[in-house]
Amino acid sequence: MSTIEERVKKIIVEQLGVKEDEVVNSASFVDDLGADSLDTVELVMALEEEFDTEIPDEEAEKITTVQAAIDYIEAANK
């Protein structure tokens, strides 16, 4: 079974069409990975589906980096 971090990064690669080595924990979806607002919405939806969770809009707005996504999912899965 993959770790949460590995699964989150795999989703980011698939959703944003970026190279795996670009998806470092400090990377910003918009500034570093070239995502636009639609990309980030689709990314949140993919995370919700993969981890069978619901991310409220006010929380989704705070998920702007790879690490923020990992942290949110880890907290939601405790």
UniProtKB/Swiss-Prot annotation:
A Gene Ontology term for the protein's cellular component: cytosol
DNA-binding among keywords: no
Subcellular location(s) per record: Cytoplasm
Reported modifications of this chain: 4'-phosphopantetheine is transferred from CoA to a specific serine of apo-ACP by AcpS. This modification is essential for activity because fatty acids are bound in thioester linkage to the sulfhydryl of the prosthetic group.
Modified residue annotations for O-(pantetheine 4'-phosphoryl)serine: S37
GO MF assignments: acyl binding; acyl carrier activity
GO BP annotations listed: lipid A biosynthetic process
Main location: cytoplasm
Alphabetic keyword roster: Cytoplasm, Fatty acid biosynthesis, Fatty acid metabolism, Lipid biosynthesis, Lipid metabolism, Phosphopantetheine, Phosphoprotein
Domain Carrier: 2-77
UniProt similarity note: Belongs to the acyl carrier protein (ACP) family.
Protein purpose: Carrier of the growing fatty acid chain in fatty acid biosynthesis.
Protein name: Acyl carrier protein
Species name: Edwardsiella ictaluri (strain 93-146)
Taxonomic placement: Bacteria, Pseudomonadati, Pseudomonadota, Gammaproteobacteria, Enterobacterales
